UniProtKB/Swiss-Prot annotation:
Residue positions where Phosphothreonine is found in the record: 200
Disulphides: none
Ranges of compositional bias, category Low complexity: 611-631
Annotated InterPro entries: ATPase_NBD, Chaperone_DnaK, Heat_shock_70_CS, HSP70_C_sf, HSP70_peptide-bd_sf, Hsp_70_fam
Record key words, sorted: ATP-binding, Chaperone, Nucleotide-binding, Phosphoprotein, Stress response
Protein name, per record: Chaperone protein DnaK
Amino acid sequence: MGKIIGIDLGTTNSCVAILEGNTPKVIENSEGARTTPSIIAYMEDGEILVGAPAKRQAVTNPRNTLYAVKRLIGRKFEEKEVQKDIGLMPYSIVKADNGDAWVSVRDQKLAPPQVSAEVLRKMKKTAEDYLGEPVTEAVITVPAYFNDSQRQATKDAGRIAGLDVKRIINEPTAAALAFGLDKNEKGDRKIAVYDLGGGTFDISIIEIADVDGEKQFEVLSTNGDTFLGGEDFDQRIIDYIIGEFKKDQGVDLSKDVLALQRLKEAAEKAKIELSSSQQTEINLPYITADASGPKHLNLKMTRAKLESLVEELITRTIEPCRTAIKDAGVKVSDIDDVILVGGMTRMPKVQEQVKEFFGKEARKDVNPDEAVAVGAAIQGSVLSGDRKDVLLLDVTPLSLGIETLGGVMTKMITKNTTIPTKHAQVFSTADDNQPAVTIKVYQGEREMATGNKLLGEFNLEGIPPAPRGTPQIEVSFDIDANGILHVGAKDKATGKENRITIKANSGLSEDEIQRMVKDAEANAEEDKKARELADARNQADALIHSTRKAVTEYGDKLEAGEKEKIEAAIKELEDAARGGDKTEIDAKVNALSEASQKLGEKVYADMQAKAGEQGAAGAAGAGAQQQAQPQDDNVVDAEFKEVNDKK
């Protein structure tokens, strides 16, 4: 059985890890980096770039370069968070037929799971290149506060990328696994994982206990905001730069997509620099032009200015921390360790606020970029049976229930319930002789159903006529270890039953997923063909070069007819290499190899002759050298002594 890899599919960056024995290993990608930007670019010729190559060309191709797509995964187009992003993103966010938020690139509509699958495919390939074997299974992380639709969509992305997703695991829980596994403190420890990434924020309170030599990680509570992260911090800086430039130059850059892409890069760079220095300079020559000529942007920014711009965003993370502490039934003083995860936690002001709230310094021995992928890899080794000393008890982040009479949300499973879990409750009809009931499933904390997220609905039909309140309909909720919900309804009188896995009344249908899997496989096939063609062209170029060189040196030893034959074969191979037919190139490579066989024999004979001459000269030289050797030795000795004397 192959390894189960751990993937941190991040909003801004992604990371892949495995366990080698008991040691976690974060794998470098083909560019030599341990994290990969979650950026995907669709080129004019149909090529898809992922990671650093996509990021490098973003400035010149902003409409077809997708980033922060995780913010759209499993979301409806009409959701206010999505509507907010529409005005900020240089690429086009559109409404799919099922009401989901999709993106439009080069005249084709793409579902967010389809786009995220490109990043997952790169992670899969990174692991395969390192392991030297195919990888088919993975544990993928999601923000703890992701709802059912978002988890389902992430699982779909894995399938489209050709991965069997063995488990969806919460990011803070994964970080806790990475942190707690090698710690040998005895007794129970309560830790708070504060995870502020590129697009999402999570806080989890987790208890690590030693139970008969087994490490037990129990999530006591979780909270967060799935639309708050580094991208929002960048946006505050971008808005500030736009405002300053407008005041200074009278030009509004917010409508210029090329300028916006450059501003995004500059904002991210300034934010990172201000974590280690007090001031930075944002310098963007030729940012735009008007009738008076080109305009340059030059702006100094201090750490204090940045902190004032994002203060409200940092403060927004504290309320979920309060709720999580309360839900866990602990006091702030009970927390033994605070772990920071996600790139944004490198910001000194964030660290300061966390210290202020928890009353203690956060641990510095956790890598905020890699801990989540490492934790996912550890969970992978637990699932494959390689590790038997770890038990993970996670929770569902939000309450789940159904709509009952009067539009009330009747909770079936309350938030922070340990998963997997099951719950059943008996309901009845609201009208006399009602032949069917519609079960509407919601997720959220509001008292009225409409204030929560509708995950899906289904009917139970064929209920025998009876006065209202008489039929007994048992509704059962079952959450699996991925946090994905399965719901059933059964008429106790007739035994009639209907079960569904909540796929939301949006999400991707099985047919769509299968089509995307096929597209992805076709893409992989195209990539393979393109690679084979490139290899064939390289081989052709190398052969042409070496043959030409040999003709220049030894051509005078060939008969005129042989030389012409070689020249003709070179010309034919050059023509074939310019085309796109690999079979044709291979055939012409063979033809040139055959045509230049005589030439090869001449080269070989000449090399043999030269080697013979060198051998004779070498033997004579060796004798002379042996005679001179003792003197050489003395010279070297004297040199060493001289150096030692100086010391």
